[in-house]
Amino acid sequence: MALNLQDKQAIVAEVSEVAKGAL
């Protein structure tokens, strides 16, 4: 299942937020 660019950006944003919270 291919993700479009907006989906990828949204996932990256979520992962970044989680990573910041984990630090």
From Swiss-Prot:
It comes from the Bacteria. GO terms for cellular component: ribonucleoprotein complex; ribosome. GO terms for molecular function: rRNA binding. Keywords: Ribonucleoprotein, Ribosomal protein, RNA-binding, rRNA-binding. Belongs to the universal ribosomal protein uL10 family. Forms part of the ribosomal stalk, playing a central role in the interaction of the ribosome with GTP-bound translation factors. Part of the ribosomal stalk of the 50S ribosomal subunit. The N-terminus interacts with L11 and the large rRNA to form the base of the stalk. The C-terminus forms an elongated spine to which L12 dimers bind in a sequential fashion forming a multimeric L10(L12)X complex. This is Large ribosomal subunit protein uL10.
